[in-house]
Amino acid sequence: MFKFILKRIALMFPLVIVVSFMTFLLTYITNENPAVTILHAQGTPNVTPELIAETNEKYGFNDPLLIQYKNWLLEAMQFNFGTSYITGDPVAERIGPAFMNTLKLTIISSVMVMITSIILGVVSALKRGKFTDRAIRSVAFFLTALPSYWIASILIIYVSVKLNILPTSGLTGPESYILPVIVITIAYAGIYFRNVRRSMVEQLNEDYVLYLRASGVKSITLMLHVLRNAIQVAVSIFCMSIPMIMGGLVVIEYIFAWPGLGQLSLKAILEHDFPVIQAYVLIVAVLFIVFNTLADIINALLNPRLREGAR
């Protein structure tokens, strides 16, 4: 098992290097000189060759590309993502509070997605082929097909504006989490519930389940055996939903005026504030790699057959 964990962790590093290099290249995605991009982003009215040369020297754009990447990566490893092109403030100071706000929303939403997916998946699998199963799958398919921004808008109009039950936007207290969490749960639970249902159906069709049924084992005991084996899906759901939700919160945070990474990154994109964009992309990508690896390790701990297959 120790070798398996080391192998999984070792595989993370080349992925992080590739992702970080692609993130670094965001500075060069425009056709113009990065120095010109910075000056335009700062609202400089008259971009002269002297200003371009001064900016190139200030930000190290005269160095070879790989040297620039090395310097940027070493700084990023110390959580120093440079300074904002717009405000001149350290990016870490802007990213820090926004990251914590997004992380709290993401964790709460991931827990709700996991609980909802497990409940719906288990009930649907136990009632497969019956009205309850068909109803759950139909509703899940319908809700998954609805755009998140539309669901968010409907909830704001009816719950916040007309009924005046919950705040429409911002982060003013615990009640501010309710509407965004509901929208995120609706968007993702319908997707993950199908994975839980499929796993449960596969487990219910296993030979050991048929044997236990034939032996007269009580339904509750049988369910405990099946749920124990199906828990791997729940682990994967929780681990994978965190980076996926965090990376997909841009629209939700914008609609609810949530002071998080999504809104900050959207503003940075509109302003061409590349250091902020780089920090956002790198954080989300690294979290995705880390939680994916964590899910593999936990699943291998729960299922020795996965370790055998990875050798």
From Swiss-Prot:
Chief site of localization: membrane
Segments traversing the membrane: 9-29, 105-125, 139-159, 173-193, 237-257, 274-294
Disruption phenotype: Deletion of the cntABCDF genes decreases StP intracellular levels and decreases the import of iron, zinc, nickel and cobalt.
Topological type in the membrane: Multi-pass membrane protein
PROSITE patterns cross-referenced by the UniProt entry: ABC_TM1
UniProt entry tagged with the keyword Repeat: no
Annotated Gene Ontology cellular component terms: plasma membrane
Signal peptide boundaries: none
Superkingdom of source: Bacteria
Induction profile: Up-regulated in metal-poor media.
Subcellular location: Cell membrane
Description of how the protein assembles with itself and partners: The complex is composed of two ATP-binding proteins (CntD and CntF), two transmembrane proteins (CntB and CntC) and a solute-binding protein (CntA).
Role this protein plays: Part of the ABC transporter complex CntABCDF (Opp1) involved in the uptake of metal in complex with the metallophore staphylopine (StP). May be involved in the import of a large array of divalent metals ions such as nickel, cobalt, zinc, copper and iron. Probably responsible for the translocation of the substrate across the membrane.
Family: Belongs to the binding-protein-dependent transport system permease family.
Protein name as annotated: Metal-staphylopine import system permease protein CntB
